[in-house]
A protein has these predicted regions:
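Transition-metal
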Residues: 2-195, 255-284, 307
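Short, basic/aromatic beta-hairpin or loop at an interaction surface
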Residues: 194-206, 325-337
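Functionally critical, mid-to-C-terminal surface segments that flank or help form catalytic/ligand
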Residues: 268-324
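Loop-centered beta-sheet repeat module
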Residues: 203-251
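His/acidic/aromatic-lined binding-pocket segments of jelly-roll/cupin-type domains
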Residues: 143-144, 152, 174-177, 215-216, ...
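Short acidic-glycine-tyrosine-enriched beta hairpin
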Residues: 213-224, 341-361
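Ligand-binding loop in jelly-roll beta-barrel domains
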Residues: 136-138, 146-151, 160, 170, ...
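Short beta-strand segments in beta-sandwich/barrel cores
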Residues: 317-318, 334-339, 355
Length: 381
């Protein structure tokens, strides 16, 4: 399934979503879609900007957008404590500004409005002045939970330059945090040996492309940074939190010959991917970090996002006064509460599987675990 961008180039739209080694740092070496449902009420008034411009921003929760896909499993709904009759849910889009798939606020006076409407209304007050100057009314990050009951397609994402040239769009840099892993769970990230573009095409044609990809057995807590151009695939048994640029461009390289939900083979983008792939081999693809209890553990810092992990048994306060950006908080385990220092009344309960957006106007936030709580936070800057 593909859509037409105003540049006239047909844009691949696929099941899953990478970006540029020299643009990002992590703790390793670097040089309407089928099966989509929003949980809960949607809609709400759009024409409220004038009346609400002076209203106070507050921590926002969202209605998850659940995606049924051919490789999806049954873990997301119970993990998030949501009730749905959907099956084979492969993704929960926690926070999305992707056109046509925008997240809807689930709490407070802005309930029922979309994230795009709020960005248009509050601009830098919501996302940060520098962020808004660079990205405009499109919320710049796409936040997901992913449940792989079977292997995802092998794929790659174009960088900003190529995406702009072909699709009048942004590229896609992303990262994975492994929330949970079944026995034998694995994923693919990066080339294991140097190949040429011509050899890449031959290996796709003769079904041997996986022979030159780096395979990782994974466990909870593992982190992978995926710059645009890096071939990758999530494997069977992985449950992952994904942070990425707001972009829905994916080039599917290899799909194991399987059929899609419509009973037909899913489209491949062999030639488009040929020019998007980074053919370099790197000494390390997995991010190494030291986990400190009750403290901030920085996982990735790059121009697109800075992501940290917290494993808390006691309250922790994150100072946001020096950050000209929003803060996205994903609760990946346990439960507790979140208090915005801008208004002590803005204390939210937070449980496993929930995602909260802290506005850029906040000067700080305190995370208070009930009986242990693990968080992933992301901001730009």
């Amino acid at each position: 399934m593909r859509k037409v961008i105003n540049s006239g180039v047909r844009l691949p739209i696929i099941d899953y979503n990478k970006s540029q080694p020299d643009q990002c740092w992590s703790r390793h070496w670097l040089p309407k879609r089928e099966g989509t449902h929003a949980v809960g009420r949607t809609g709400g008034s759009i024409d409220q900007a004038g009346a609400n411009m002076n209203k106070t921003m507050y921590p926002l929760k969202f209605k998850p957008i659940l995606k049924t896909v051919v490789w999806g499993g049954e873990k997301i709904a119970p993990y998030k404590e949501v009730v749905t009759d959907q099956h084979n849910i492969g993704e929960s889009w926690e926070l999305s500004g992707v056109k046509g798939h925008e997240s809807v606020i689930a709490n407070g006076e802005f309930e029922g409005r979309t994230i795009t409407e709020l960005v248009e209304q509050f601009k830098g007050k919501l996302v940060g002045e520098k962020v808004y100057a660079n990205t405009g009314n499109e919320f710049p990050l796409l936040i997901k939970f992913i449940d792989a009951k079977s292997d995802l397609s092998i794929q790659v994402h174009p960088d900003d330059e190529l995406a702009a040239k072909r699709h009048n769009s942004k590229g896609k840099t992303e990262m994975w945090y492994v929330v949970g892993a079944d026995e034998g769970a694995h994923l693919l990230s990066g080339l294991s040996e140097k190949i040429t573009p011509e050899e890449y095409v031959k290996r796709v044609e003769n079904n041997t492309i996986t022979d030159v990809l780096t395979n990782f057995n994974v466990k909870a807590g593992d982190v992978f940074f995926l710059p645009a151009g890096r071939i990758h695939a999530i494997g069977t048994g992985c449950f992952i939190a994904e942070i990425q640029q707001t972009s829905d461009i994916t080039y599917r390289i290899y799909d194991y010959g399987r059929l899609g939900l419509d009973g037909k083979p899913r489209e491949l983008h062999t030639e488009l991917a040929k020019d998007a792939i980074d053919y370099n081999v790197y000494p390390e693809y997995k991010t190494n970090y030291t986990e400190k209890k009750d403290d901030e553990n920085v996982l990735v810092e790059c121009k697109y996002f800075t992501t940290s992990q917290y494993d808390l048994d006691k309250p922790f306060t994150k100072d946001l006064s020096g950050i000209d950006s929003f803060l996205v908080v994903m609760c990946i385990e346990g439960r507790g509460s979140l208090t915005d220092h801008e208004d002590e009344d803005h204390t939210l309960t937070l449980h496993q599987g929930e995602t909260v957006l802290i506005p850029a106007t906040s000067k700080g936030v305190t995370f208070t675990p009930s009986s242990g709580m693990k968080l992933i936070t992301s901001y730009i800057g």
